UniProtKB/Swiss-Prot annotation:
Gene that this polypeptide is encoded by: basT
Alphabetical list of PROSITE patterns matching this protein: CHEMOTAXIS_TRANSDUC_2, HAMP
Originating organism: Halobacterium salinarum (strain ATCC 29341 / DSM 671 / R1)
Domain HAMP: 317-370, 437-490
Family assignment from sequence similarity: Belongs to the methyl-accepting chemotaxis (MCP) protein family.
Methyl-accepting transducer domain span: 509-745
Name of this protein: Transducer protein BasT
Function: Mediates chemotaxis towards five attractant amino acids (leucine, isoleucine, valine, methionine and cysteine). Probably transduces the signal from the substrate-binding protein BasB to the histidine kinase CheA.
Single GO molecular function: transmembrane signaling receptor activity
Amino acid sequence: MSDIDRGLFERVLPARIRGSYAAKFNVLLLVVVIIVAAAGGYIHLQTQSTVGENTERRVSGIAEQQAATLHDWLTQKESTTTFLASNIGGDAVRTSDVKPQLERQLATLQQDVRAIHVVSTSQDTVVASTDDARSGTTLQAGDAPWLSTIEDGTTDVSVSDPYEVDDSPVVAMTAPTDKPGWVLVMTMSLAQHSQSFNSPIATGDVKVVNGDGVITLDNRNRALLEQYTDTAGNVPAAVATARSGQTVYNTEPERTGMDDGRYATAYTPVAGTDWVLTYHVPRGQAYALQSEVTQNLAGLVVVALVGLLLVGLTVGRRTSSALDELAGVAAAIADGDLDTTIPDTDRTDELGQLVGAFGEMQTYLTTAASQADALADQNFDADVLDEDLPGAFGASLSQMHTRLEALITDLDEAREDAEQTRKDAEEARAASERLNERLERRAAEYSDEMAAAAAGDLTRRLDEDVDSEPMQDIAEAFNDMMGDVEATLAQVRSIADAVDAASTDVSTSAAEIRSASDQVSESVQDISADADQQRDRLGTVGDEVTSLSATVEEIAASADDVAETVNQAATESERGQELGEDAVAELERIEATADSAVERVTALEEAVDAIGDVTGVITDIAEQTNMLALNANIEAARADKSGDGFAVVADEVKDLADEVKESATEIETLVDDVQADVADTVADMSELGDRVDAGSETIEAALAALDDIGDQVEAANGSVQSISDATDEQAASTEEVVTMIDEVTDLSDRTATESQQVSAAAEEQAASVSEVAGRADDLDDQVSTLNDLLDQFDARAASADTDEN
């Protein structure tokens, strides 16, 4: 599998990790842990930011709401002050009537209104007051800080700085009445009003700081009229910033009158005044939601990590161990160890199915290997061959089994036919030997008779009652010749002694030629039964030569026919040799075909080895598929929250499924190749049978050619007979007879060479032929002498004729 075919996760891993499912599983768990932790951190940061913004908006909103409420309260009090001042009459008002009026009005006001005074600015005295202790008193600047706020001729309501009255912090509002020189003063309890702040957050702390940095209002009444400072004793800069019209939000330490700790604080201005309202909420309370979300998120992350750890220790570890065992089994099978033990499992999931598939594959391969071994050993009765192998591969093995059985049956039949042919040839050779023995005996008798005739006993005759027509023809011709010889004995008496001496030498040579011919006949018995007749004809030629007579010239003419016939016999012998070479070539081609069959079987074995490699690929893909299937289950459980992760894993599973499909295609192609190799092997075996048949036909053709050689030898025998009948022409052709004898000698040599392939007697025949050649030379000398004598005889005959004429 190339890098292109692997997933991104597989390509980025080092080779050491890719080779181990456990390592990849642990890396994946680590990646998931990192992703979960990163997601938790991101959610935490997002929550912190969101909660921080919400907290800021909430705290600032509460501060602004409280400031608006305070502004409404001040506006209401100013309106009340103006209303009360307007109810004080003009110049006709009596002092005694003012106090009751003020008391009636105080009774209608809120409880935070402490007292109402009417002050004469010209006399700095209290004209009337709801506080009896104040009525008719002269005001001092220390007792009435609001005096500084009264300005003659102003119609506006003024608000004094906070101060204490009887240890109670108050603030006063002044407004001029309709009576000139009189001013209405209404004092309000800051402690009473501070309690009116309604904080939505129970732990919220509301403080109002005036322009001097003094705490004017405090909902907890713990620091009224104290300086509002930070831990360093300084007024926070945020107060001045808020006084300029901005709402400021900070997380800062405690301020005056607050418990230690950090607070979420909002500073906001109070409209129409130089006051600043501050709202403090303990940070833990303000960010309680953030803390809760963080805790819940941390708990979720911990649960997820623990779950992943448990999955890794249980499912992942068990799966890794099982896959390691399967990988070992697959490696053993790929190495040819089909007896390796596949671990048992009671799992019914994909891993259990994979283990079962390995078992089935092991059984399949074991059966296929056993059947292949049985076929290789030609053990066609093996029980394993009866087992059914599914698929094209099993069908190919079955077909090969059938064809091999048929081929071996054909080979056995061909072997039996060849054995029968050999037996027939041996019987034919035996019959030929028996015939040859009879002919040899008859030839010996003829030789004795001819030798006697050659010695001068012209009364000898040959027995014409023989079972061989050529021998019968020879006997008849000899008897006729001897009659002619007796008739002409008187004419050739003058040269009878010389002819007798020459005939004796020729007879001796002829005997030697006959002996050599006998050896040649014995050497070529495996070639043809009729080869023996050739030896007989050559013996006859020797005998006929001893019977030289007046017909020598006719013998020379017939010698041409003998040479031609013997040449034809030599040609047929050469043709037999060529056919023998063709038979050898056919056997070589048969051997080449067998080599090709061996190569096909070797290719079949290599294809079986390639099936082990594909099994390794299927093992790797199974490991990855199992791991990604586990991840898919984990992601599926979280699909309601993280559907994208499940989609990624699903894509990985799909990619691996495609890879499995490609590997399956590769296996199918490989099996097709194996089937093709098996088909080629069967074809080669068929071709081997054809070659054997062709070899048999070639051998039969060689035997037929050898039969033709026998026929040609018979023709040569006929020519020799013609030589016997035409001895009167021998005188004119003596030199040609010598030449023909040399050619016959050469032909005998070639016949001996061919006979060496059949029998060890070829060397003896060659030696005999050489001896015959030597004897032929001696005969040539004698014939030369005879020619001289005959020339003299012819001359004498011609002279006699002349005299007679």
